[in-house]
Amino acid sequence: MNLNEVISNIAHTLEGKKLIDSNKTLKPNDDVNKSQSSNDSFPTAMHIAAFKLVKENVIPALESFHKTLIAKEKEFEKDVKIGRTHLMDATPLTLGQEFSGYASQIKHGLKSLRNSIDHLSELAIGGTAVGTGLNTSPNWDTTVAKYIADETHK
């Protein structure tokens, strides 16, 4: 668990000590790894990161993009062009209709992203190696989940 060693070493240097010092205050396995496993902490960290990115950045950007496409749909509702399919000319349509198709795709993508938020809110923390919670303190999972919820405003 290299990450535990990295975290321990960072804490050690933040205390003003050198990495070559053998007496480390924060031990990689006894302190950093306490009550968790890479099988629950990494998926939990990934869910938190994805949750924040999707909710705070991706969804707002796509909502703005969707509004722009709707505006373009109206702006070009009377501009007729040739539709294309299979690299060939097809039937006429308006440029507004084409933008409508793009807007529809973004709308469906937004719906899928919003649905994913609930799934990303499910955390593996506290499950340890095989999901049993073995070697964790009582209520570890709920305590950590509450802290994460408070920090992420979820």
Language-model-derived ranges and their functions:
Residues 1-154:
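Conserved, well-structured ligand/cofactor-binding cores
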